């Protein structure tokens, strides 16, 4: 009630939804603690788990990837310990799908930097992105980033070529085996 009284409906509804997801992930982790670091299901990307790298590439760690917006997200995460929910999903998707790195490596990277890090929310959200705890992989494109982040970040297609394209084009490029 406090949140609903203090904030408008849209703001309070989103916050309450995020709390509900956090509660769901914690409950799931309580009942399935063995799945915090293991794939709940197989990847639904057309690739086997062993085809993904075990470690983050150096350009991700150092925020020097070919994609400007991803570098901005990495720098924000490592310098502030915070990253907006959409930016977390974009960065996770980039790491797993665009760079073919196991979700566990990205989850560890996030947990080492997030001030609000919760292992259950973090890891199962990574699995949802990766498709090991969802029906399909989560992907994004530059248009989606522009829709949710355009006010705070300058987004130029020529500096973000990896993520510039329609969902169909990106999906075909990322998942040629599907």
Spans of model-derived segments:
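Beta-strand-enriched accessory nucleic-acid recognition/scaffold domains that flank the catalytic cores
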Residues: 89
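C-terminal catalytic domain of photolyase/cryptochrome flavoproteins
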Residues: 1-85, 93-178
């Amino acid at each position: 009630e406090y949140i609903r009284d203090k904030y408008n409906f849209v703001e309070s509804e989103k916050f309450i939804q995020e709390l509900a997801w956090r509660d769901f992930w914690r409950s799931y982790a309580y009942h399935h603690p063995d799945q915090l670091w293991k794939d709940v299901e197989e990847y639904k990307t057309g690739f086997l788990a062993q085809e993904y790298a075990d470690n983050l590439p150096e350009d991700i760690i150092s925020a020097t990837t070919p994609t400007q917006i991803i570098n901005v997200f990495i720098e924000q995460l490592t310098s502030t310990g915070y990253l907006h929910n959409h930016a977390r999903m974009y960065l996770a998707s980039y790491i797993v799908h665009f760079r073919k790195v196991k979700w566990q490596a990205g989850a560890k990277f996030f947990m080492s930097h997030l001030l609000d890090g919760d292992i259950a929310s973090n890891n199962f959200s990574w699995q949802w992105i990766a498709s090991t705890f969802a029906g399909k992989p989560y992907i994004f494109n530059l248009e989606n980033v522009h829709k949710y982040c355009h006010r705070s970040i300058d987004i130029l297609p020529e500096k973000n070529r990896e993520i510039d394209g329609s969902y169909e084009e990106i999906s075909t490029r990322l998942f040629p085996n599907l």
